Amino acid sequence: MDGAIQSGDLKLAAHIAQPSRAAAGPRPALVLCHGFPAGPRGALTSAQTYPDLADHLVAETGWTVVAFNFRGTGESEGNFSLLGWLDDVRAAVDYAVDMPRTGGVWVAGSSAGGALALCEAAEDDRILGVATLAAPAEFDNWASDARAFLAHCRLVGVIRDSSFPPDVEAWAAEFKKVQPLAAVAEIPPRPLVLMHGSDDPTVPVSDARALADAADGQADLRVIAGAGHRLRHDPRAVAALMGWMERQGVH
């Protein structure tokens, strides 16, 4: 079903996928975080396949899956900021925790959404495990030329208001404040799987290796041979994600 998640003053569009025949007792929930949109006006369309992925995961695992749109994307309100997106992950986790019969919450994310999943899990022990697909280890490339990246944000449509951000320097400083590489060390011993395509042209596979190293060998690193950046479209990555879900010991 379609729903809305409150993140501060903003409403985020969400797709809540649940088993058609719910088993008795608590049911695990997965919060699914999309990545940064690609291409002109990509903010409107780039996350459109996530509801289908959520439905597929539910059909195969029996979990509840919450797939939401970050602020500035799809039908969600607001404009992109990195700390704002981190707030959105927390709001989605709050929503999942408060759903009736939730039996624990896990988070999975693609690209920037995966990096933010790591950062939220480092601060939120309600999150019982994290799976990432093509997550970057840091956001320094966005910080390197903040005004050029701001122009890119307007092009893809994640910043819709001409008056936003009110302070470009403060907006850009958030890219240095959000540090997935530091956050990942706080997640073990909770389950952590890092999936990455060996031929990812957007986020190099070295980022996944750096994250795994920072987790002190306690992450399950899966490098998928020949795969690119959009792992949600790779059946091997989706199968690995479902296998990870099934190993969480909740069935």
PLM-predicted stretches and their roles:
Residues 68-82:
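Glycine-rich "HGGG/HGxG" loop immediately N-terminal to the catalytic nucleophile
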Residues 1-24:
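N-terminal cap/lid segment of alpha/beta-hydrolase-fold proteins
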Residues 36, 69-73, 136, 227:
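Short beta-to-alpha linker loops that shape the active-site pocket of alpha/beta-hydrolase fold enzymes
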Residues 20-60:
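Short, surface-exposed "cap/lid" segments of acyl-processing enzymes
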Residues 49, 79-99:
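Alpha/beta-hydrolase active-site loop
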Residues 12, 106, 124-210, 214-223, ...:
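The alpha/beta-hydrolase serine catalytic core
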Residues 109-119:
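Glycine-rich nucleophile elbow surrounding the catalytic serine of serine-hydrolase chemistry
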Residues 100-111:
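Alpha/beta-hydrolase fold nucleophile elbow
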